[in-house]
């Protein structure tokens, strides 16, 4: 369950008895894609916030933490990673981290919802632009 009340976006986790809230300056974007509801907010302290179907996906301020932890443990424990496939990851943050590994020769990103990637280009440009500058031939499916 999520709510936007009195300038706060709140994601509530009833089963765990917890909630996560960010103070919102304004809503930047909202659309219903063929796959999910996509919302982008500008927050007071965490930069932009992406929400999919009411669930927080990333913020400008802390997205690197999520992507680093998803990527580096797997690639550092693999003997010699050369080819990587990322399922999802439309904001391109995981792809950005994968491309930091010099042994990776191919990286494929498969994202069902192109709108997530397009809105990431607009509102979270750093991970997306990094991936294009690092490996311009990276395929997006």
Walk through the language-model features, giving the residues of each:
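A general beta-strand register signal
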Residues: 51-52
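Single conserved hydrophobic/aromatic residue that forms the stacking wall/gate
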Residues: 132, 137-141
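N-terminal auxiliary segments of SAM/dcSAM-dependent transferases
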Residues: 2-44
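The AdoMet/dcAdoMet-binding core of the Class I SAM-like
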Residues: 2-9, 58-133
């Amino acid at each position: 369950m999520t709510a936007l009340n009195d300038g706060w976006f709140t994601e509530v986790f009833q089963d765990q008895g917890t909630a996560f809230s960010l103070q919102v300056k304004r809503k930047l974007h909202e659309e219903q894609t063929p796959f999910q509801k996509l919302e982008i907010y500008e927050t007071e302290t965490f930069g932009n916030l992406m929400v999919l179907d009411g669930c927080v996906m990333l913020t400008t301020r802390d997205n690197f933490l999520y992507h680093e932890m998803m990527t580096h443990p797997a690639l550092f424990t693999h003997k010699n990673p050369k080819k990587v496939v990322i399922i999802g990851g439309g904001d391109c943050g995981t792809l950005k981290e994968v491309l930091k590994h010099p042994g990776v020769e191919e990286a494929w990103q498969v994202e069902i919802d192109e709108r997530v990637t397009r809105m990431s280009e607009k509102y979270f440009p750093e991970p997306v632009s990094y991936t294009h500058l690092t490996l311009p031939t990276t395929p997006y499916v």
